[in-house]
């Protein structure tokens, strides 16, 4: 371990590995869940703080030949963290682009807390994207059809298909759980292939991971 003027250049510790694991799980869950999951604000903030900390250590170690090898390792860790964050955010933007109307409608109907579901940037993006798409459809399609058919009701909004099948794994033993009239004893060591909707609350509650 090298410390002092240049900070602690120890290998990645258990806390950092745990944070990396949480970030990867957030990305994979977002990737395989058909709906938009709550924005992992705490995890993202912690990861960004860790990136800034490592970047600061690397910058201060440039002139110290004894720390350059470890600094190079840190730079690789930084790039890995940035890559996973990028993948996570891209998955979310894809869903916002696809389901923007249903997301905003559910927020409007108080089905979701907007500040848990979306980051501040995502809220602004979703609203602006909807305004852009509404304007596009109005100018290219709706103006050319009778007014009686111009209004879009909630049934015509694109929504995620929640009955898709997914692979999932409990984070802990959950005991008996009712899934489509069948009782399943969820074990931490087992992997299941089930419809998403019955386990949606477990995924959103952090008790089940998608794989």
UniProtKB/Swiss-Prot annotation:
Function: The GINS complex plays an essential role in the initiation of DNA replication.
Gene Ontology biological-process entries: DNA replication; DNA-templated DNA replication; double-strand break repair via break-induced replication
Keyword field: DNA replication, Nucleus
Subunit comment: Component of the GINS complex which is a heterotetramer of gins1, gins2, gins3 and gins4.
CDD domains: GINS_A_Sld5, GINS_B_Sld5
Protein family membership: Belongs to the GINS4/SLD5 family.
Subcellular location, principal: nucleus
InterPro entries according to UniProt: GINS_A, GINS_bundle-like_dom_sf, GINS_Sld5, SLD5_C, Sld5_GINS_A
Native species: Dictyostelium discoideum
GO cellular component: GINS complex
Locations listed in the record: Nucleus
Superkingdom of the organism of origin: Eukaryota
Protein name in UniProt: DNA replication complex GINS protein SLD5
């Amino acid at each position: 371990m090298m410390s002092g003027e240049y900070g602690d250049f120890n290998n990645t510790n258990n806390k950092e590995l745990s944070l990396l694991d949480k970030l990867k799980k957030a990305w994979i869950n977002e990737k395989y869940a058909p709906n938009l999951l709550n924005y992992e604000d705490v995890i993202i903030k912690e990861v960004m703080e860790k990136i800034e900390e490592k970047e600061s250590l690397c910058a201060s170690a440039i002139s110290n030949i004894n720390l350059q090898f470890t600094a190079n390792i840190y730079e690789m860790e930084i790039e890995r963290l940035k890559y996973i964050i990028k993948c996570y955010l891209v998955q979310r933007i894809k869903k916002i682009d696809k389901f923007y109307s249903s997301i905003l409608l559910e927020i409007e109907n108080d089905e979701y807390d907007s500040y848990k579901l979306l980051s501040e940037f995502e809220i602004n993006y979703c609203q602006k994207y909807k305004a852009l798409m509404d304007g596009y459809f109005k100018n290219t399609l709706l103006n050319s059809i009778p007014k009686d058919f111009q209004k879009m009701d909630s049934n015509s909004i694109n929504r995620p298909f929640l009955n898709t099948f997914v692979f999932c794994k409990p984070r802990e033993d959950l005991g008996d759980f009712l899934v489509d009239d069948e009782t399943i004893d969820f074990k931490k060591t087992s992997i299941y292939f089930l419809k998403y909707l019955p386990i949606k609350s477990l995924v959103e509650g952090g008790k089940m991971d998608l794989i």
